[in-house]
Amino acid sequence: MPSALTAPPWSAHLEQAFAWLCHARREASPHHGVWRLRDKWDHVKAQLTEELANRTFRFSSVKLTRTATGDLMECWEAQDSLFLKALTLHLQPTLSRKLSPSCYHLQGRGGVKGAIQQIRDWITCDPPRFVARSDAKGYYANIGHSSLFRVLGDLGVDPPLITLISHYCRRLVTRDGYYAEQKKSISMGSPHGCSLPFPPR
């Protein structure tokens, strides 16, 4: 029986992730890593498949950069972004079956438009006196890794996949020559962050 890291869907998910990356980075600068990855995709895919089978895959360090608005953002290498997208696609079926139907960020749930439509329907059927929108400041920056891994295990995610997610969470972030391993938080600059069930610290 194939393991969670060598099951047939992985090949299709890597191809889907490759198509996504090519589209998302279609206007990237000539020096962006996506162009080297596109040029050597067959070799990269074979290497990723082998590293998955051998459980030797590791993420590169993540660059912390400042955006035009002054915010700090983590920038992943092209290959790591592709792999995280493939991992997200691989996890979606398991998480979609077990997470609340109100989690509209999951694939097939309608996203922001679906959430807005649900609120409109609710207001139409039973008009409330007030509607409030809230957000917890620093919530994602304070996600506890051990709590997240425990929730993923309870949801039935295979241990080898949780190990990969742990490498993603405990990423090595670099800025101005300094390196720091992340002890908490998830990276919101990756395609994987929005697919996870977020437990509080």
Residue ranges and their predicted role:
Residues E51, W122-R201:
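Conserved polymerase palm-domain catalytic core
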Residues V44-S61, T67, D71-C75:
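Heme-based O2/NO sensor domains and their adjacent alpha-helical segments
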Residues A4, T88-H145:
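Active-site-proximal segment of RNA-dependent polymerases
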Residues H23-W35, L64-E74, K98-S102:
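Glycine-/proline-rich flexible loop or hinge segments
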Residues E15, D42, A46, D80-L89, ...:
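Non-catalytic, well-ordered alpha-helical scaffold segments
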